[in-house]
Amino acid sequence: MKKTRDNPCDKIDCGKPKNTKGVSLVKKHIFEDIILQNALNFTEEVVEIFGDLLNKGMNITELVARIKELTDKLGRGAIEAIIEELDRIIKEDKRRKEKWVVERKDKKRLTTVLGDIEYERTYYKSKEDGRYTYLVDDALEIGRHDRIEKGVKIKLVENAIEESYERSSKKACPEELSKQTVLNAIREIGEVEVKREIKEKKEVRGLYIEADEDHVPLQDGRDETPRLVYIHEGREEKNGRNVLKNVYYKAYVGEKPEDIWIDVANYIEDNYKEEKIEKIYIAGDGAPWIKEGLKWILKSRFVLDRYHLNKYVLKATSKEPKYRDKIWRAINEGDKEGVKKVFDELIKAAEEEREKEKIKEAKKYILNNWEGIKIYSEDEDVIGCSAEGHISHVFSARLSRNPLGWSREGLKLMAKLRVFSKNGGDLREVEWGKKKNINAGSYKLTKKQIKEAVRRVKTSTNEKINNITVLNIGKVTPIYRVLRALKYAQVI
């Protein structure tokens, strides 16, 4: 629907300003009139809502929705007026006239967190190199082909980190956006990572690295295994809970194991004094890609995740639970031969071949990971592994619960975004996209211009408030009270 603005003089009696060279001051300073008219309209509509509340009744949710709709509308009008006023200031500037020639005026529609705005701005041609641009858009960092402002994109991506693209698109702004718009915003931001500011490398005796992977369906019917690695300094108590100390998460999709561990090794080198580290524990389920880390991380030892250890003990003893305590006793004592003996007894006791194979598989898993098991009884600094819970919270909660499957690109970007969020990242601090605006910096207001513009707007607005008929009549109404407050408190 095409937006129109009321003529401020239709509703506000601004008095009869003196004419200078046949030019109406109302036309010259339309910005102030629009802002003042919007304030009046807002006041009238708030009073109307209050009347509906008293006469018809409404609950707090309905009241909030009505007021939000109203404030969004007020905000859109203010933004449109401000942009067009800035365009006028640039157009009248002597410096601009020396370098840029006016070509024409064009309209632009932009989706914001307040909804769609539409404004007119001036198109210019450079006298120096012949390039064309909209100087007001350059000043506000609005790209030539931008249809959605950055604030909306940030909300789209922030919502998409936790929810589906469809839900995200419905929450970012009042306008209807598509799922593709969400994906485009995610593509624009790219692979993000929180870069911690390092003033001085830390000294620690021990470091803990935990790793696991998720299994995520793709749109082509295949599966992908995004991998999660996180580095921390042990556990500490906060608000009655054990939490990981100085934890940092990393996500990998499609990378080779050696590339993963080179990246982890670089993180350790960048953040810690390696010569002071005595021990590094790499914990996980024993997958080859996790054990690959032992080749790349100095002073590292493997620790088997007790979740998976328990899983295989239960698997082996499902038909003979009486052997469970025997296996755990041998494990806790670091008695490898004792573990073998109990498993041999289990295999003999199994009646079905399928049950025997299941027990043999569990035995093989435990013995192949024995170094990561016996370390529990040898090293008091071992704290176990919480990777299974983290993979569920960081990845599975969003990645493996998409019934339609992911594109490979979308999965990688979302995995990176999930750990970006876990690491405390702020999308407002990220440089979006790789495209550079060649006209950036084409025009900047001087301090003198800014000061003069603010002074003029304040003076002109106060004059218009003084000339409003409703104030001069003196009849006490809600509009009268608001305008008196504006007049004497000089809010505007």
Swiss-Prot record:
<dbReference type="InterPro" id="IPR009620">
    <property type="entry name" value="UPF0236"/>
</dbReference>
<protein>
    <recommendedName>
        <fullName>UPF0236 protein TTE0402</fullName>
    </recommendedName>
</protein>
<comment type="similarity">
    <text>Belongs to the UPF0236 family.</text>
</comment>
<dbReference type="Pfam" id="PF06782">
    <property type="entry name" value="UPF0236"/>
</dbReference>
